């Protein structure tokens, strides 16, 4: 069977994965309203193409935090890739390196950051951190990723507690009891070489903690999970270098805005002072184009990467990235945009938003 679009990969991945694994990957919070709206919100947006322009050459390249990538399509931090493919994040990293895009490696990866970077030593890697109550763990993790050449630290802010994911409960998947970590261990635990039980983020983290984290690293800090003007303005005030507009794929608090709907508010609030990215609901090249037109520097993909991994491992992830890049290339040509720099809000029919 030919897999021609991301929806094809989703259908095939569901056939290949166990129900427990599928429920974990696809799991949404509560009634799944935000999960579904992430997808539906893109369908509500219409494009205003411009014609009679020379689009014989299309350039999808852009930069994020000063690093060039081949397309504004990167990989979000998602946990436990070995659920989908034995080599897990190592295969994902190899595909990202071949595509020359950024891969944000999760705190809850199946392999250590050392193993993942060794598999793709030339890749552009950011690290996603769930701030831990034990600051020695945070400091140790920052030191490790700096030594490995990571280019940014992504702090997830929308998970002070785990969302109410009914699918996981129905599958009897107890994350804290059954999943072991390779990375987030205290210095004492790490000497044993044994995985440690899943460590949940600190529920007491606040804006006042950011200066301490900034004092530990030279890396730019990106906040993932911002949805409002107020928090975006606070991010700028605290010298944060970027924001990923995200609702955690609808896995945390249900009934919050779709990421693409929140994007305009955040972009307006930062007023060009820092870079803004988004994830949540991107499934086609049209979706990428809409996000860029509304001010995202690039988009990040979550679940579709796992679908590709489940279907074909490294090759599947690369195919997912290639399909989306090719779709974006086509959409740019059909809308009159020769480069990412030419994608602007003028492409969006605001009267229908």
Curated annotation (Swiss-Prot):
<feature type="modified residue" description="Phosphoserine">
    <location>
        <position position="171"/>
    </location>
</feature>
<dbReference type="InterPro" id="IPR012133">
    <property type="entry name" value="Alpha-hydoxy_acid_DH_FMN"/>
</dbReference>
<dbReference type="GO" id="GO:0010181">
    <property type="term" value="F:FMN binding"/>
</dbReference>
<comment type="similarity">
    <text>Belongs to the FMN-dependent alpha-hydroxy acid dehydrogenase family.</text>
</comment>
<feature type="binding site">
    <location>
        <position position="224"/>
    </location>
    <ligand>
        <name>FMN</name>
    </ligand>
</feature>
<dbReference type="InterPro" id="IPR037396">
    <property type="entry name" value="FMN_HAD"/>
</dbReference>
<keyword id="KW-0597">Phosphoprotein</keyword>
<keyword id="KW-0285">Flavoprotein</keyword>
<protein>
    <recommendedName>
        <fullName>2-Hydroxyacid oxidase 2</fullName>
        <ecNumber>1.1.3.15</ecNumber>
    </recommendedName>
</protein>
<dbReference type="Pfam" id="PF01070">
    <property type="entry name" value="FMN_dh"/>
</dbReference>
<feature type="binding site">
    <location>
        <begin position="279"/>
        <end position="283"/>
    </location>
    <ligand>
        <name>FMN</name>
    </ligand>
</feature>
<feature type="binding site">
    <location>
        <position position="156"/>
    </location>
    <ligand>
        <name>FMN</name>
    </ligand>
</feature>
<dbReference type="InterPro" id="IPR000262">
    <property type="entry name" value="FMN-dep_DH"/>
</dbReference>
<feature type="domain" description="FMN hydroxy acid dehydrogenase">
    <location>
        <begin position="2"/>
        <end position="353"/>
    </location>
</feature>
<feature type="binding site">
    <location>
        <begin position="77"/>
        <end position="79"/>
    </location>
    <ligand>
        <name>FMN</name>
    </ligand>
</feature>
<comment type="function">
    <text>Oxidase that catalyzes the oxidation of medium chain hydroxyacids such as 2-hydroxyoctanoate, to the correspondong 2-oxoacids. Its role in the oxidation of 2-hydroxy fatty acids may contribute to the general pathway of fatty acid alpha-oxidation. Active in vitro with the artificial electron acceptor 2,6-dichlorophenolindophenol (DCIP), but O2 is believed to be the physiological electron acceptor, leading to the production of H2O2. Is not active on glycolate, glyoxylate, L-lactate, 2-hydroxybutanoate and 2-hydroxyhexadecanoate.</text>
</comment>
<keyword id="KW-0288">FMN</keyword>
<feature type="binding site">
    <location>
        <position position="251"/>
    </location>
    <ligand>
        <name>a 2-oxocarboxylate</name>
    </ligand>
</feature>
<feature type="binding site">
    <location>
        <position position="165"/>
    </location>
    <ligand>
        <name>a 2-oxocarboxylate</name>
    </ligand>
</feature>
<dbReference type="GO" id="GO:0019395">
    <property type="term" value="P:fatty acid oxidation"/>
</dbReference>
<keyword id="KW-0443">Lipid metabolism</keyword>
<dbReference type="GO" id="GO:0005739">
    <property type="term" value="C:mitochondrion"/>
</dbReference>
<dbReference type="InterPro" id="IPR013785">
    <property type="entry name" value="Aldolase_TIM"/>
</dbReference>
<comment type="subunit">
    <text>Homotetramer.</text>
</comment>
<keyword id="KW-0576">Peroxisome</keyword>
<feature type="active site" description="Proton acceptor">
    <location>
        <position position="248"/>
    </location>
</feature>
<feature type="binding site">
    <location>
        <position position="130"/>
    </location>
    <ligand>
        <name>a 2-oxocarboxylate</name>
    </ligand>
</feature>
<comment type="pathway">
    <text>Lipid metabolism; fatty acid metabolism.</text>
</comment>
<feature type="short sequence motif" description="Microbody targeting signal">
    <location>
        <begin position="351"/>
        <end position="353"/>
    </location>
</feature>
<feature type="binding site">
    <location>
        <position position="106"/>
    </location>
    <ligand>
        <name>FMN</name>
    </ligand>
</feature>
<keyword id="KW-0560">Oxidoreductase</keyword>
<dbReference type="GO" id="GO:0003973">
    <property type="term" value="F:(S)-2-hydroxy-acid oxidase activity"/>
</dbReference>
<feature type="binding site">
    <location>
        <begin position="302"/>
        <end position="303"/>
    </location>
    <ligand>
        <name>FMN</name>
    </ligand>
</feature>
<keyword id="KW-0276">Fatty acid metabolism</keyword>
<dbReference type="GO" id="GO:0005782">
    <property type="term" value="C:peroxisomal matrix"/>
</dbReference>
<dbReference type="InterPro" id="IPR008259">
    <property type="entry name" value="FMN_hydac_DH_AS"/>
</dbReference>
<feature type="binding site">
    <location>
        <position position="128"/>
    </location>
    <ligand>
        <name>FMN</name>
    </ligand>
</feature>
């Amino acid at each position: 069977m030919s897999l021609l679009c991301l929806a094809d990969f989703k259908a095939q991945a569901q056939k290949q994965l166990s129900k427990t694994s599928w429920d974990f990957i696809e799991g949404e919070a509560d009634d799944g309203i935000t999960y579904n709206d992430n997808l539906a919100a893109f369908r509500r947006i219409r494009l205003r193409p411009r014609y009679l322009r020379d689009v014989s050459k299309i350039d999808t390249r852009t930069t994020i935090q000063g690093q060039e990538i081949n397309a504004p399509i990167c990989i979000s931090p998602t946990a436990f890739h070995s659920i989908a493919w034995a080599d897990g994040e190592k295969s994902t990293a190899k595909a990202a390196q071949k595509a020359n895009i950024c891969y944000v490696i999760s705190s809850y990866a199946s392999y250590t950051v050392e193993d993942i970077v060794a598999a793709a030593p030339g890749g552009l890697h950011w690290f996603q951190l769930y701030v831990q109550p034990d600051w020695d763990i945070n400091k140790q993790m920052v030191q490790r990723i700096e030594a490995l050449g990571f280019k940014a630290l992504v702090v997830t802010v929308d998970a002070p507690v785990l969302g109410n994911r009914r699918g996981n409960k129905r599958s009897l998947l107890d994350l804290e009891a059954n999943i072991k970590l390779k990375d987030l261990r205290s210095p004492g635990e790490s000497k044993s070489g044994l995985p440690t039980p899943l460590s949940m983020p600190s529920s007491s983290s606040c804006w006042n903690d950011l200066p301490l984290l900034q004092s530990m690293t030279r890396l730019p800090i990106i906040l993932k999970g911002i949805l409002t003007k107020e928090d975006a303005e606070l991010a700028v005030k605290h010298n944060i270098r970027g924001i990923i507009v995200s609702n955690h794929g609808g896995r945390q608090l249900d009934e919050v805005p779709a990421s693409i709907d929140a994007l305009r508010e955040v972009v307006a609030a930062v007023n060009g002072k820092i870079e803004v990215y988004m994830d949540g609901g991107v499934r086609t090249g049209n979706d990428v184009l809409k996000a860029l037109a509304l001010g995202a520097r690039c988009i990040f993909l979550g679940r579709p990467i796992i679908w590709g991994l489940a279907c074909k491992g490294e090759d599947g992830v690369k195919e997912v990235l290639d399909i989306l890049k090719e779709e974006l290339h086509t959409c740019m040509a059909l809308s009159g945009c020769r480069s990412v720099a030419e994608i602007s809000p003028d492409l969006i029919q605001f009267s229908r938003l």
